[in-house]
A protein has these predicted regions:
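Rossmann-fold dinucleotide-binding core
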Residues: 38-43, 56, 62-174, 182-210, ...
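A general alpha-helix detector
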Residues: 141, 156, 223-224, 276-277, ...
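Glycine-centered, small-residue-biased loops immediately flanking beta-strands
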Residues: 53
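Membrane-water interface at loop-to-transmembrane-helix junctions
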Residues: 271-282
Length: 355
């Protein structure tokens, strides 16, 4: 796919010159940090915008902020789209998964652009209109919550392989390679597989053994947990993953506690095989997606998003961080029953879980 290396981009030095250079209705996409930077950028742009121009917020904005901005701009006759974007650096180069929400007529105007730049799976763009106001950013928040959960599950699987089964890094690489060739085929398992082979250029030691076990977070996982509690939805895997990130950040406290308590060897892991861990991870992948999607189901009904869950799973299949082969199974489940309360109630999904 062309990356636009020969594409000419004109730079400007002022908001006025930039906005006057755009065709009408203007379509302005913001990719700035969530919070105040979004509001300040909108404030700077407003004097140079006309009726029915469209502002697109492509950052990880909180859904409450998106609703506030939508109402504020509507009063000024400016269209607003809150669009979740997933894909990282690869998504920027080869096409992301895009999750837009707002007015349908506004989306129809930007639809050709989004479909052109988004990732493609089987020739189909990984973007679709999701629903009103904050639906796009809410779906992206849930996407990130699921991502948190899966990353924690992968981390714990690695820990058992490394410290429970005493496997070497190359063995773990081969194990993850086998997993990724099967039902666990996914972006996160794929990149984790590759990490185990990487060596540090300075010491020639494996990089995985040198990485500080201290994770940071941008807040979207926390927002997912907070919102689930507000709406009375249980998402224990995602909640636990957020807590584990917080625990990991207290490195000094953990080291201090480690000195006070002796490390005991647990012999019960001797009966566990990597195939057992694979089965547990498949089960946990399904459950994590089920938790996130069940939260979306409840909130969609509360906020009248009218989300199409088959389409959500469809656009998550490419360009995004939680891309996974299992999404094909989830799509089929929602195709059979669009009002499915929880994935675990689908017959085919229950067969996967029972294995």
């Amino acid at each position: 796919r062309k990356e636009g290396k020969d594409f000419i981009v004109d730079g400007t030095q002022s908001e006025k010159v930039f906005l006057n250079s755009l065709s009408r209705p203007r379509k302005v996409m913001l990719l700035v940090p969530a919070g105040e930077p979004v509001d300040s950028t909108i404030k700077k742009f407003l004097p140079y915008l006309d009726k029915d121009d469209i502002i697109i917020d492509g950052g990880n904005s909180h859904y409450d902020d998106t609703e506030r901005r939508y109402k504020y701009l509507k009063e000024k006759n400016i269209k607003f789209i809150g669009a979740g974007v997933s894909g990282g650096s690869k998504g920027a180069r080869f096409g992301p998964s895009i999750m837009p929400g707002g007015d349908r007529d506004s989306y129809e105007i930007i639809k050709p652009i989004f479909e052109s730049v988004s990732a493609k799976v089987k020739g189909e763009p990984c973007v679709t209109y999701l629903g009103n106001t904050s639906s796009g950013h809410y779906v992206k928040m849930i996407h990130n919550g699921i991502e948190y959960g899966i990353m924690q599950l992968i981390s714990e699987s690695y820990h058992i392989l490394k410290n429970g089964l005493n496997k070497e890094n190359i063995e773990i690489h081969n194990t993850f390679k086998k997993w990724n060739d099967g039902m666990l085929n996914s972006y996160l398992v794929e990149i984790t597989r590759d990490v185990f082979k990487v060596k540090d250029e300075k010491s020639d030691n494996y990089l995985i053994d040198l990485i500080l076990d201290k994770a940071k977070q941008k807040g979207t996982g926390k927002w997912t947990s907070q919102s689930a509690m507000d709406f009375g939805v249980s998402i224990p895997t995602i909640d636990s993953s957020v807590s584990m990130r917080i625990i990991s950040s207290f490195k000094e406290t953990r080291v201090k506690a480690q000195k006070l308590y002796s490390k005991k060897i647990i012999s019960s892991t001797s009966s566990i095989k990597s195939d057992d861990i694979e089965k547990a991870l498949i089960f946990s992948f399904v459950i994590t997606f089920a938790q996130g999607l069940s939260q979306l189901k409840v909130v969609s009904e509360e906020k009248l998003y009218n989300l199409n869950f088959e389409k959500i799973c469809k656009i998550w299949r490419g360009g995004c961080i939680i891309r996974a082969q299992l999404l094909e199974d989830f799509m089929q489940a929602y195709r059979k029953n669009s009002s499915l309360d929880n994935l675990i109630f689908d017959e085919n999904i229950s067969e996967i879980i029972n294995k």
